[in-house]
Structure formats: structure tokens, C-alpha cells
Amino acid sequence: MNRDRLHLWQDRLARNDSQYENWYTLMDERERLYQGSRYIFPLVNKYRKNNAQTPHVRNICSELIEAQVDSNIPAPKVTAINEKDEELAKIIEDMLRNELDRLPFAEINDLMERIVPIQGGGAYLVEWDNTARTHTTIGELNVVPIHPRQLVPQDGVYSGIEDMDYIILKLPQTREFIYRRYGKDVSFENEAEPDVKGGDGGTAEDMVTQYIAYYRNDAGGIGMYSWVGDVELEDLEDYQARRLRRCAACGELEPTADDGDGEQHALEEEEDTEEPADGVAGRPGLPPDDEDWSGAMRWIDGELWPEEDDKDEEPEDHEARRCPYCGSTEWVYSEEEYEEIWTPITTSLGHRIPGAQEEMYLTGELDELTGLPVPAVRLVPTRVPYYKPLRYPVVLQKNVSVYGQFLGDSDIDKITDQQNTTNRLEKKIIDKLVSSGSFVTLPADASVGVDENDMRVYRPETPADANMIGVFNLEGDVSQDREYLDHVYEEARQIIGITDSFQGRRDSTATSGTAKEFAAAQTAGRLESKRVMRDAAYAALFELMFKFKLAYADEPRAVRTLDERGNAEYKTFDRFDFLKQDASGEWYWNDAFLFTCDTSAPLAANREAMWQ
């Protein structure tokens, strides 16, 4: 473990965390207001107690936030820049629609629809999960919603995540998860920041706080550093690079079980299961995820051994895999820039990638007759560069953009005063009503009990005593309070831009269908900025999902779509369909596509269009 690297990132975390400390406090207050805080802010601290509370809360913060919730997930729209790529654009679009159905986007969207207007923004974390497997595929996309409380952006950079040198995430994890994934024992570490997991903020015995820093490396790629407390978990200079095992002696790649070389396979140890193709493990940048590898652990004869364990500690009866070229049993991991293709590949769209080709070379031996070097022929594979997304795996969604601010504008901040005034008036109205009541007047010498019995007898001595008997009802006048309460509520709605028509309530001001349509259109204009920012975030998310799929989905993936008549149609997303060759013979990956959101939503999903 590199202590200097650990201290460097711990210092960066502490420095940037302190700059956003006031924002974190404000985030907690916003959550309390949304959940219905009874606290009343004092008008003048000198004359009013700071711990005043209302016995009754009309939660206008929650009401106006819930009125804006849209359960419809934006649909992807992919446009090809080149005409010949139209079919590929349609496959990408259908693939993204399938991913929206496979992933729990209904729950993710439901959560983000509340986080974003409450806090002013939220984020999505895109990862490649190699533990998700089927019989024919290895790895799947994974998208996780990130609360702003879990983000530590680089201080002073407000233009966007891609402009930052680094960004740090705080993720609550269990100790067992850390051990399974990284092979590191963190049982002695405590939960450093329990607030990031939400709830009451209490410390859980089995939880720890994992910090993940994504940074821009010197080559322009993405690096990653992760730690828990004082334990380093990962340090990957090129987080999105492929890592394969090579022989420490001769430098040749470790062969897989399906290479087709009988002599080579005879030198390998017998495996119970077939070894899958090279791929990234756990997340992009980790070693190949075969049956011998799981996160930062290795399976050796059915037992899990940490990566950092010394080779001498392996079971005595375990026969190490032997290099078929030099016989060495020592292997090291290396970052690979190119993929070697030995067998020709033909994709579902008919694209053909050539395999190994014959190449003539000089052996170094001299011909006895001519004295010239002896030529020989060898097979040389087609070398294709591995694709890298070169993007931070974090996508930010803002509520409304604000200059000089990392997150957008919060709706809760705009109506905090109105919520406080509402709490104050509710308390005042209740105090008046509770203080009201009935009073009975009797002569001074009267002895009439007050109980539930009727027809009690009282004999006044004089007519004057009889005239003194009476009942007075004292009622507090709350008409002005209620009138102002309605005014404050309407004020809050106007600040956010919510109308009765948008909420589906009876609107007495709209006396015709045209008036209804105009009222809904006004609301749509007020909230248009939020929808634009939402669509922009989803468009960036769709692009990142495609790039991760292009980089790490080694096997062709089935894609279901519908044709013009609504019948099911099945296609294939194959990353090699995006592999192109320029005029000079160099191979490159075609990712030149435009990503937006499809605004042609059905009428039932468009509340503004329902009035048209």
C-alpha cells in the first residue's frame, strides 16, 4: 500500500469537504422541511425562543415537490452523424430502451424526481458489473443514483464534472462487501460518515464508508483511487484500461481454454469449468474476470485467496498454471492497449474483421549457400485498440442552472420562508381556537355543580340573582389568519410555477377549454427549464451507457425492438459493428452519434398536451 497516495487523497477529501460543509448542513435542513419539520424560525432572535414548534404542519414543501413528480422515464433518441450509420443508431437506441427495462429505472427515476428539486441536483453513477452473468454473456451495465450528500466535487470548479481534475464519492458499504470485492479486511474500521446513507444518520455496526476518487490522469484518461479509513482498496492509474495476465518471464499472454492449440492446452492445468474470454472484472480496469478471479481475490482449488497473499502460501497440492511458451509459472497483470484477433469475425450486420495473417520475417540464421538471412513465415494477429470511454462515470442532473454553483437551484430554498410563515400561522390559529370556550355566570352564593347531569335545580333568592345566570361563548377571530394563510400558500405556488390546472384541481379562473389550455401552457413554460435539464442529464447518461457497452460488452447482445407494424423484432448489439478501418489501414471505434431524448411522448404522458 502506498501511504503517500493514501494521505494525498485523504487531504484532498478533507480540504474539499470543508469547503462544502455549509452546503451539507443546508441539505439536511432541506430534507427536514420536505419531511414536515415542526420547527419555527424566530423572527427576532432577541425576543423569541429558538425552539418554538408548531403542533400542526401544512407541508407545502412536500405538496409542491410532489406536484412536479414525473414518473415517465425519458426515451432515448440516437442520431447518426453519417448516413451509413443509420442502422447502427437504431440498434443503439433499441439497446438503450432494453437497458431501461432491465435496470430498475422506475425506482431510480422516482427517487431522483424528489432529490433533484429538493437539493437542486443529483447524480448517476455508471459502472460495469462483471458479476452479472448468463450462460453466454459476462458483465452488464449498472446505474446507481447518487445523493448530493455523497458527492465531493473539486472546489472552485462549477462548469461541470468533466472540467474537474477529480471528484470523490462517499458510498456506504458493508464490511463483508468490501472483503468479497477487494479482499481487504476492514473489520477494525468504523463508519466514518453515517449521514451519507440517509435515514436518522445513526452509525451501523456492519457498515463502513467507502471513498472512491475518480481523476483525470496525465494521458487524459480516467484514474481511480478507493479507500476505507486508512485501508487502500484500489489504485488504478488507468481505471478504464483492460488488464490481462502475461508471463513474467517471456511476456506472452496467458492462453484461454478455447485457443485451439492442443500442445498449448496440454501444458495448462485441468480446469473444472471452461475459462471465459478476456474481460474486465468487477469494474473496468480490473483484471480478467475468469473462473480464477473474483474482484481482488483468486479461487485456488475451491478456496478464496487474497490477491496480496504470497505465492508461497498457496495450497501445497495446487499445480500453478504453466506458460506454454517458456514453462514459467509466474504471471503479472499488464495494461493492454490492443486486442489481438486470431480468428476472423463476422458480425450480424455482415462486417468482417480479419484474423491472423501470414507474415514473412528473417530468422537470423544464414543460408550456407548464399550467406543471406533465412526467411520464415509466422502468423500475426490483427491488432485492434481497446475502446475507452474517457469520461467520468458520474452524470450530474441539475434542477435549474445557477451561475457559480455546482448544483442547481433548490425549490425548497425558494419557499422556506413561506413554509415557516405557514407553520407560524397554523400555531397561532390553533392557539386561538384552543383558548376559546364557554363561560357561565352565576350569583356569588350559587352552588351549582358542573357535570354531565341535566335538569339541575337552582332557586335564586331574588329576581336579580336570576338575571345573573348566563352563558358567554368566547371565540377567537381566525378569519384574517386563514386569509393570510391562503395568501402565503398561493405565493409559494407562484414562486415554483404551479397552478390549479397543473395539479389537476378545480380552477375557477379558467372558464373555458381555451382558458384551461392557456393556464396549463403557462405552467409548462415555467417548468420547461427543469424538463430541459432533466432531458440533458438523461442524454448524457444514455451516451455514457453506450460507451461502457461498447468498451466492455465482449459478446454480442440480443436486442428486442418493434417494427413499423408493432411486431417484435430481434437484433444484435455487437461492438465489432462499430469497428472501422481508415484509409491508412488503422482500426478505430466509431462512436460518432448524437444522443438526445425523444420528446414525442404519448398524450397520457404529457400533462401539458392533455388540454390541446
Give residue ranges: language-model regions.
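Short, well-ordered alpha-helical packing segments
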Residues: 93-100, 109, 113, 121-125, ...
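Extended amphipathic alpha-helical segments with heptad-repeat/coiled-coil character used for oligomerization
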Residues: 130, 514-612
